[in-house]
Amino acid sequence: MVESHRGLLFYPTLYEGFEYSRHCIYTGAAPNQNSLQLARYLLSTYGNRFLLVGSNYIYPYESNRLMADFVMQGRGEILDELYVPLEAGPGDFEKVIGRIKKTSPDVIFSTVVGRSTSVLYEAYRSAGFDPAKMPIASLTTSEAEVAQMHPEAAEGHITAAPFFETSPSRAARRFVESFKGKYGPDAPVPAAAEAAYFQVHLAMRALARSGSDDPEGVLKELRDSEFDAPQGRVRIDPENNHTYLWPRIARLDKSGRFQTVWNPGVRIKPDPYCVVQSLDDWSVDDLHTVSH
């Protein structure tokens, strides 16, 4: 629809990759900016036996396929791959909990989304599992999902994202304070909110340079443009309309807040097609290796 009407879409959430539209600017993480780094961290920290669980639609299928590839590269094993409805309730996770008990994986990789996320984490807690030994690791469990669960259910689990509400940089703190000042002190500030924020700035700057709201002119100005976002300086890759981002991994503490456990301080060039699906290839932008 966007292309047929010569429009322009900004997409602020992570996604499964393998897509391109010249009429879309992708500001969320591509798989080589979150999945790859998360796989490396989990394999080196917890072990190589994974159980995959996701919501029943395209993103989890593709995300789990990529994670399985990375795990196999790390000489790991996929013990099971299970899917639940998009609006899954406690009963939908009974089989998942049963399989976890039977297989005892080192890591549970979750691509469960939305309100079902808290149901999974609460079921995990009720089963008495120990996140210090067998965490749930995710790309889709953000501050927004954590806000819907008890802190005790969140504690110890892992998420990879380019931005966390607790990011310590001055720019991040200023952004979070402004966000909560507008939407309330309890409003969660996930990576998608940060991406939505900086993409508006990129769009308005491109619009000003173009001097017109014609999408073609704005697109021309957007490609290769940069902005000092809360996560770090981001850039639109002119090759694929995706964004150079700063990967991070965090663990949830007893208060249900993310605490960074891995931050290489490098900006990663987007590779939405995962041309090189290797645990050793980060596509690092060597010009930007400043810790944020």
Which functions belong to the PLM regions below?
Residues 3-25:
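Flexible loop/hinge segments that line or gate small-molecule binding clefts
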Residues 10-12, 27, 139, 160:
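Generic beta-sheet signal
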Residues 52-55, 187-194, 215-218, 234-235:
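Surface-exposed patches in mature extracellular/periplasmic domains of secreted proteins
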Residues 124-197, 208-213, 262-291:
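Extracellular/periplasmic periplasmic-binding protein-like sensory domains
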